[in-house]
Structures are given as C-alpha cells and as structure tokens.
Regions:
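DNA polymerase sliding clamps and clamp-related checkpoint/processivity subunits
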Residues: 1-26, 31-161, 167-264
Length: 264
C-alpha cells in the first residue's frame, strides 16, 4: 500500500487553546476560510452584520509539526460543525489537521492521547466559500491598554444586564466603563496598577479623552476568548473601531475589531 501524500499536515499539543478558539469563533463566524501558508494560519473575516472583523494569526514556527505541499492552501470550514468534533477533546490530546492529496474536499482531524493510548480520527467535509479580500489600513492608536481578561469579561457581562451599549473611555491614567439602561446606569473606573492590573502600554495624549461606544452583545461574545490568556490588550482611538487582542496560548493571537455605535 502506497504511503499517503498530504497537501496539509499540522500538529499541536496546545489542543485546549484551539478548542477555546473555535468555541469563541463559532459565535461570531458561521463559516470561515482558513488560509495556510509558510508563515502559518490566518483567518480574516467579517461577521454577517459587517460589524465585527476577526483577524486570527497562528505562526507556523509555534506548531510541533507544520508542513504544506503547496505555497498556499485555503480551507473553508463551518465553525459550528468543527466545534462539534473537537469539543470533547482532552487537554492532553495532540491535535493534527491534515488534507490528503487525493481527497482535497475533506479535512482530517486526528486526536491522539499517549497517556490513554487512544487515537480518534474525524473527516470533516470542507466548504467552497467566497474569499473576501479584506484590507486593513495601518492605524495609530492614542491608547493601548492591557488588563486581566477575566476583569474585562465580568464588566461586559455585568453591564449587559443593564444596557445594550457600553462607553469605554481613556482619560489620564484611568480607564472608565459606562452604561445606561432603562432602569439603571453604571460607571466603573479602573486606575493603573504596576503589578497584574490595568496599565497603559501606550498613552500618547493623557490629557485628552479617547472614547467610543460599542455594542455589549458583541463584547460578551468576544469574552468567550477569556480562557485563552490571562491578559488582553485594548486598542482605543476616537471615531474608530475598538480592537481587542487575545493571545492564543503560544500559537499566535486573535484580534477582534468592533465598529463603534453611532449615537442618534
């Protein structure tokens, strides 16, 4: 029997991070094109409402094994179906993704657990999706903030119980979250901390107010990425989308961009 030839074959031991990533992505993108090239894996896509932009980048050098049979391979995946296959994946499993040369319409998913001496293989039918040519011009942000991901998640969840929108404001050395609903309003102010709390990575104009109003329902979905990393980065600029950056363990990062709400 001849040895199988692969046009795609990648392997990682960071299976739990990959599972959390797919679980979060399926809430934002129903389907997505995963682009594989020599540098790694990339997803650049907008949600159906064209309010959210997802930019995922996982670096080839951070995988245990990464080999392509072509310069570039685009793989169309239904995120919900992918999650159904990997949601029971054990944290100690090694995850392999592969496409065989003679079966390019199917993504192979292999889960191996050395401790349990088990191997599970799935075959996921791929989709022929339209390729969006999304270009993001570089932007300079007045404020770049880092804060614990669990704190951001809690603020967004709690405020979503009161209101639909949240105002995020950077002023001086403080970060302010505000919301106003039908029966109550809330304001939470966070001061800079040098050890483990909120801090400014960049604060070009501390005397100026940098702020935006954003839909909480999207930020609550974003916060499903919380378990990926202990800290997030917020990129804030007046009259510009909010960018939230999560590290995907040590594989790479995902940036979620949310357009501001226009108050009428």
């Amino acid at each position: 029997m001849s040895e199988k030839r692969y046009i795609l074959n990648v392997k990682t031991i960071q299976s739990s991070a990959f599972r959390v990533l797919v679980e979060a992505l399926k809430e934002i993108l129903t389907d997505a094109n995963f682009e594989f090239d020599a540098n790694g894996i990339k997803v650049m896509a907008m949600d159906s409402s064209h309010t959210v932009l997802v930019h995922l980048k996982l670096l080839a050098k951070n995988f245990e094994f990464y080999k392509l049979g072509r310069e570039k391979i685009t793989v169309g995946i239904n995120m919900i179906n992918l999650f159904k296959l990997i949601k029971t994946m054990d944290n100690n499993d090694t995850l392999s993704l592969f496409i065989e040369e003679d079966n390019e319409s199917v993504l192979g998913i292999k889960l191996e657990n050395i401790e349990k001496n088990t191997r599970t293989k799935y075959s996921l039918n791929l989709m022929d999706l339209h390729e969006d040519n999304i270009h993001c011009p570089p932007a300079e942000f007045e404020s770049v903030i880092t804060m614990p991901s669990v704190d951001f998640q809690k603020i967004c969840r709690d405020m979503h119980n009161l209101a639909d929108n949240i105002e995020i404001q950077s002023l001086g050395s403080q970060l302010v979250f505000r919301c106003s609903g039908d029966f109550a309003s809330r304001e939470t102010t966070i001061g800079e901390m040098s050890d483990g709390g909120m801090s400014f990575l960049k604060n070009d104009s501390p005397d100026d107010i940098v702020q935006g109003i954003f839909a909480l329902k999207h930020l609550v979905l974003f916060s499903k990425c919380t378990n990926l990393c202990s800290n997030i980065e917020l990129y804030l600029k007046n009259d510009y989308p909010l960018i939230i950056k999560y590290s995907v363990a040590s594989l790479g990062d995902i940036k979620l961009c949310l357009a501001p709400r226009v108050e009428t």
